[in-house]
Each structure stands twice: as structure tokens, then as C-alpha cells.
């Protein structure tokens, strides 16, 4: 088969301990999945989960021991950080039951759901989709994927983010409103999951703005952390 132009390269993510990389299919994100974050955004309760997406090429790979540069995006003066656990899907399926979800997980990574909060809020006020606030170039910094078998305690792991050495976000994966397994069950009822899908599982409280020159360092117990410098 020939193409009218050369197709873009497949986006892929490093895997801890392997030379092979993880090819990215889709990026799903869960909104308001920690109680305290839901409250700081003006919501409360265990509402049904809702999802949005980022393009695969929004990935910005942060390699271990290095700080990756992220260009400050256009059209915003209020760029926010959201540190998240990312689930990497290794086996696809639809209508996956929570009890079977672990069979579909390849591994986990640390990710940032970078958000143009001013644009997101403007779209919310107008009752319009807020893709412009979430789905932009470099909006999904992510570290290497650790195979699931190597992090059996991920469901109770600590999660944190520092900006310029100061704590901004600190919580525990156990505080997810919808657990990893429940999220997979709900998500796979709406879309058929495929190998290569990523799920950003939501952010804890403490989201806030970053500026050019800031350095963000995020981590989750058992996973390789990420470091991002805003340019």
C-alpha cells in the first residue's frame, strides 16, 4: 500500500527493563475521580465517572533521570498541572467486568494531564465541549511504563507532585472514587478497549497554575517518576 504522504511514526512509550516500547493507541482520561479534587472544582459525591480523550501524539515522554522540556502552550494564561496514575492496557475487550480488569492491564506509569484551565472554564460556561482545554500538543507528559507484576501494591501507592521543590499535590491511589478496575469496567462499556490504550485515572486535590521556568517533579510509589520543565 502506498500513501499520499509518509504516515507519522507510531507514538510509543519506554517500558522499564525492556528495549521494546509500548505503542499508544488512544488516551482516555477520567474526570473528577478524587473526592477532594471534585470538591475544589465545585462538585461532590460519587457521581458516575465521565471520560474525555487526548490524541495519541499529545504524549511527551519523560525519560528516567532527565528533565523533559514542555513548551508553554498557546492561547492560555492559566495552565494547570494534574498528576495522575496512568493505566496501560495490554489486552483489549468490551464490557470488561471489574473482577476481570487486571487481566487487561499491561502496566502503569506516572502522567500529567496538563490543562488550559481558562479555556476549559470558558467552554464549560458556554455549554460546549472543552477539548481545547485538555487535548493540545504535549498535554500528556508521561514516564516509562512499569509492568503490572512489578507493582502489586499500586492500589494503595502514594502519589505526589512538586513544583520548584514545593509540594502541590499529595495523596494516595486508594482515594480514587472509582477504582482502577471499576474505571475499566465503565470505560469498556462505552468503548472497546484496545492494546495500547492509556487511561489517565484522575488527579487528587491541589491542582494549580504553572509558569514558564517552573519545574514539575511527579511520582507514584513503585513507578519511575517524571520531571518536566516549562519553557
Task: Label each region the model flagged.
Residues 101-106:
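Interfacial segments of alpha-helical transmembrane regions
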Residues 1-100:
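Extended, compositionally biased flexible segments
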Amino acid at each position: 500500500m502506498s500513501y499520499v504522504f509518509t504516515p507519522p511514526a507510531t507514538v510509543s512509550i519506554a517500558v522499564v527493563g525492556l528495549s521494546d516500547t509500548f505503542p499508544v493507541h488512544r488516551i482516555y482520561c477520567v474526570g473528577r475521580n478524587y473526592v477532594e479534587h471534585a470538591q475544589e472544582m465545585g462538585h461532590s459525591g460519587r457521581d458516575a465517572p465521565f471520560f474525555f480523550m487526548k490524541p495519541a501524539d499529545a504524549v511527551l515522554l519523560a525519560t528516567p533521570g532527565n528533565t523533559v522540556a514542555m513548551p508553554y502552550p498557546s492561547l492560555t494564561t492559566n495552565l494547570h498541572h494534574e498528576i495522575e496514575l496512568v493505566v496501560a492496557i495490554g489486552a483489549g475487550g468490551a464490557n470488561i467486568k471489574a473482577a476481570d480488569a487486571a487481566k487487561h492491564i499491561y502496566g502503569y506509569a506516572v502522567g500529567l494531564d496538563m490543562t488550559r484551565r481558562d479555556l476549559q472554564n470558558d467552554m464549560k460556561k458556554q455549554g460546549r465541549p472543552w477539548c481545547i482545554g485538555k487535548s493540545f500538543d504535549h498535554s500528556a507528559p508521561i514516564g516509562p511504563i512499569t509492568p503490572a507484576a512489578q507493582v502489586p501494591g499500586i492500589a494503595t501507592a502514594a502519589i505526589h507532585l512538586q513544583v520548584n521543590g514545593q509540594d502541590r499535590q499529595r495523596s494516595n491511589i486508594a482515594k480514587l472514587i472509582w477504582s482502577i478496575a471499576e474505571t475499566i469496567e465503565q470505560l469498556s462499556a462505552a468503548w472497546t478497549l484496545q492494546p495500547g490504550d492509556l487511561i489517565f485515572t484522575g488527579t487528587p486535590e491541589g491542582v494549580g497554575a504553572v509558569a514558564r521556568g517552573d519545574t514539575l517533579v511527579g511520582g507514584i510509589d513503585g513507578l519511575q517518576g517524571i520531571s518536566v520543565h516549562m519553557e
